[in-house]
Amino acid sequence: MKKSYSGVTRTSSGRLRRLADPTGPALKRSFEVEEIEPPNSTPPRRVQTPLLRATVASSSQKFQDLGVKNSEPAARLVDSLSQRSPKPSLRRVELAGAKAPEPMSRRTEISIDISSKQVESTASAAGPSRFGLKRAEVLGHKTPEPVPRRTEITIVKPQESVLRRVETPASKIPEGSAVPATDAAPKRVEIQVPKPAEAPNCPLPSQTLENSEAPMSQLQSRLEPRPSVAEVPYRNQEDSEVTPSCVGDMADNPRDAMLKQAPASRNEKAPMEFGYVGIDSILEQMRRKAMKQGFEFNIMVVGQSGLGKSTLINTLFKSKISRKSVQPTSEERIPKTIEIKSITHDIEEKGVRMKLTVIDTPGFGDHINNENCWQPIMKFINDQYEKYLQEEVNINRKKRIPDTRVHCCLYFIPATGHSLRPLDIEFMKRLSKVVNIVPVIAKADTLTLEERVYFKQRITADLLSNGIDVYPQKEFDEDAEDRLVNEKFREMIPFAVVGSDHEYQVNGKRILGRKTKWGTIEVENTTHCEFAYLRDLLIRTHMQNIKDITSNIHFEAYRVKRLNEGNSAMANGIEKEPEAQEM
């Protein structure tokens, strides 16, 4: 009599073979076919057929269409047999089969254990029992991508204790041995197929099959000659790049459907915010329009000859914009009238184009009698306003009116170290009403630090006492932020500046400055002079504000006055030419 222990059995050659643990992770790679003997025969024997691959290969074409469903009729037939058989016996059935020879030759071993250790001896024959799933191993000749599996199905039947081995050749299995399991029965079979270690993590869902009772004759006729072959479907590694391969219908699994749709959802753009309108894009639209049209800026420099007006303009824009005055002859040293010159230069920086116009006033303050020397400058400013006004009132006016209005006037104060001259006070008092005046102390490097501080204090006091409102004006501050920024600039007025268009190397850096015996004066160094603050005010922070005040304040005042004069002249019936006079 052959003894059988849990997990150990003896083969026909006398060697002990350890059965695979139902819950163990290892996969078997041996192919085994076991034949079943009649219940009344001698103790069970086991035949190991290691060379069955050649025999199975000849009949493997017949099992190509067999699937997992072939294991279901075998479980159902064995269940019916165990219910009707009077002999208490424990049977273990291992069935083998092969799949299609195209990708590989495979074989599945199904072990059915019927033991009375798991239930009570008085339990009813029709009572439900659990079927535990053992590991499945499929072995065959294959490419490196597929992974073999081996399936073991253990069926426990109450009131049976004898272990019997059933071995049947695979050549006797017909193709039509599948019986659909659709009827309800108290027994359930749970099948769990673990995935390979290298495959993606995709567990097989538990499948519950309910079997119905079958006649004994039908059971014996189907069980002995035709053992079912449980073929575990698999997919190649090449086919499982997007979604992991699992046993069962992947299309019916909602979780797999979500995995298939996940990559597509990542490529989709995030939807725009529901409340977003797009008003902030107006800034980009204005920027593109301004880049196409460019900007215009007109600056006037007023002061005596030799104060460095042209040099300062060239230093501001770092280019040869303003030409230096040519030394006149002895007959031409004293000009009869003030000559106003305009120089236009196109500047482009980082794709931004600006049309810069510099208005120079040579001869201002160079006369012995400087009375009313400010009138030619006042007339020039008003003429530009009149020209712009006539373009506006035309019936067919231009789409874009050329802007020649003076936006800013730099008034150069000689570095005397005392106070403002009467000419300086009279000029700034009259022109501050029609143009933005920015007073500067020319050639401030001729003053010591103490002299410069004292001179600036005296100039500030003279401006306040004479009611001269220079730029930036307090009344034009729009909000608290503008007021805070403008107050810092007002404290620096007048700006003590030094101009130079010569470059020097200081500590490996290129600078604009003036070189002397005791050192180099750096133009853009705020500890040496206030040129950097003047540049920021005119170009980097307040250029657009200067243009807006010119258009909305000074030009608007001139336009109102001219329209009032025109209405009064029409009322009196007198037509007279407009005169450039103080406003």
UniProtKB/Swiss-Prot annotation:
The modification N-acetylmethionine is found at residue 1. The modification Phosphoserine is found at residues 30, 82, 85, 89, 325, 330. One of its GO terms (biological process) is positive regulation of non-motile cilium assembly. GO terms for cellular component: axoneme; intercellular bridge; microtubule; non-motile cilium; perinuclear region of cytoplasm; protein-containing complex; septin complex; stress fiber. InterPro entries: G_SEPTIN_dom, P-loop_NTPase, Septin. GTP binds at residues 303-310, 337, 363, 443-451, 499, 514. Expressed in all tissues examined except muscle. Isoforms are differentially expressed in testes, kidney, liver, heart, spleen and brain. The modification Phosphothreonine is found at residues 42, 49, 143. Residues 360-363 are annotated as: G3 motif. GO terms for molecular function: GTP binding. The modification N6-acetyllysine is found at residue 62. PROSITE patterns: G_SEPTIN. The keyword Transmembrane helix does not apply. Residues 303-310 are annotated as: G1 motif. It holds the Pfam family Septin. It comes from the Eukaryota. It is found in: Cytoplasm, Cytoskeleton. Keywords: Acetylation, Cell cycle, Cell division, Cytoplasm, Cytoskeleton, GTP-binding, Nucleotide-binding, Phosphoprotein. Transmembrane segments: none annotated. Targeted by proviral insertion in T-cell lymphomas induced by the murine retrovirus SL3-3 MuLV. Filament-forming cytoskeletal GTPase. May play a role in cytokinesis (Potential). Septins polymerize into heterooligomeric protein complexes that form filaments, and associate with cellular membranes, actin filaments, and microtubules. GTPase activity is required for filament formation. Interacts with SEPTIN2, SEPTIN6, SEPTIN7, SEPTIN11 and SEPTIN14. Interacts with RTKN and ARHGEF18. This is Septin-9. The gene is Septin9.
